Amino acid sequence: MLTDTQIREIRSRFNIFKHKIYLNSCSQGPLSDAVQAGLEDFMASWHEHGSPWELWVNRYEAARAAFAQFINASPDEVAIVTSVSAGINGVASALNFQERNKVVMGEFEFPTMGHVWLGQRVRGAEVQFVSAEGNCIPAANYEKMVDRNTLIVPLTHVCFKNGFRSEVNAITQIAHRAGALVMLDDYQDCGTRPIDVKAMDLDFFVTGTLKYLLGPPGLAFMYVRQELIASLVPTVTGWFAQANPFAYDPKLFDLSPTARRFESGSPSVPNVYAALPGFQLLREIGMEKVAAHIKKLVQSLLSCAHDLGIRAKTPADSAGPLVVLQCQDSTSFVQKLAESNIVASNRHDGLRISFHVYNTMDDVTAVVEVLKKNIDLMVRGPARVGSYD
């Protein structure tokens, strides 16, 4: 468990906490001194050398190796892409919908996941959505729909609008028993607890750096299980997907034998420089400690909301780093928080409060005080069962 002194030291590395209470890591993580130094390092290399591509590519590969270690994968199983959307599109373009054509996903997915797979209907995909029960989607609901005609099960780890954490292990087992692939979107969780893609038995894993990995927008990582790589030929591609990008031969289509075949154009070098320190900072702290600290904060806010009679959209027994409370007017409540120098966000009727390792129990107390003063803006009573509103 992290001590108060350790948390204060971590918090001091993020300038925003000098004047704000920041509880919006589910949208964008705050800027640390380490990430700022990474960006300045890139600027210095650009000023000094102009176009030091050998240096930049080395840093690019260092980021790949760091992320691979972060999720217990091989660097050859990791693609660096511009966004999670780009990674998902790359995988979708490589799949054949002739023998199996069903894509089964929950209705809590981020819109990109639905849009990408619905876009594959012109190639023969049949997209089916698993219905929720209240603010949860039980694994049993997937079992009713996944069958021998299912090609892939795209799955969000933590829902962006209610904080529900999916039963990843159970759903993965259901999919694999039917011979289907599993893709996990971990954007709303990665960086808040240890991740082991091998232990989770995943086929694909995608996440970006801008939230809990404490990095910039414009950079994402995708894991592809080693045994699958050679059989997948993405048609969403580019020169950095080739075995030798620097061959400069437009007549040669020679994909990398590694997950790099899912990459595309020139890498976003500034974002690579900024992302690497985010990984390093989290690893220095220790992911087990990060997870334990976040869990304590989440449980505290959920308990306080319960005591105030406020309806939580986040199930207490399956929560990630994001707590969502139901509002009469979520936009107005976010403004009320802003008036107290608290940064949060909303989606539909949900107030989103997200925690990370730099947050404290004092942050929870500050939110609770605003809740008490504006209780009329909140929805009262227990969470509804049987509908997601």
Model-flagged regions — what are they?
Residues 1-389:
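Pyridoxal 5′-phosphate
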